[in-house]
Amino acid sequence: MDKSKTLFERELELAAILQVPVTKRYGIVEIEEKPHKRYYRPEVLKIYMRRNYPTLSMRSDLMDALNKNFQSSTHAYFRHSKVNKMQNITNAHNYIKHLLSQSGYLRYHNRHLKGDNYKYVIRRFNAALKNYNKELYLVFEKTDHIHFLHEMLFIKNLRNYPFPTNWVSLVALHDNSPKFERILAAIRVVTEYDGDAAPEFEPDTEVNEDNELLLAMCKDFD
């Protein structure tokens, strides 16, 4: 099976940019349609790649799906180095340790030790970490390459934890640091961070009995 065909059926915008014929079904009839040539422009591809594949490691998924005939004529934005899954998992776990050592978490934890007001916050954070590890290994078992998926799962889990917004902003400011490249990619996807300003990262505002307390705690550290 031609993986590139499946890819372009899913990524119609990319197919149009690269002028790749796409098979469309009308009932039981299949018609191969080729996008208009005028749609292809290098700057359009650059915008698409920045939005959907902002880092080198993220482009590996795309390259894996393209056939060798297409790879020989790929644009520079698609070139990448081979991804090391185990190294990515190690980096993800190191990032967890990094978060646990940050002042924001320590403030919550220290206040929790002095009273019960922050017990719910600590429990929720630990549950997010546990869920993150579980999902991480599920992804690891099912995929040949892991890129930024585990960071993305983690960032999504953080939406259920009342993080101060400046925590994520602080990570996002490390735009030139390779160490934070993958977490930045996840932030871009989850928060639509465009690289020009710190992303808006609001806690989950679903109605629950602890909502007012959680939002109040976030304001204390913003």
UniProtKB/Swiss-Prot annotation:
It comes from the Eukaryota. This is Uncharacterized protein C03B1.6. It comes from Caenorhabditis elegans.
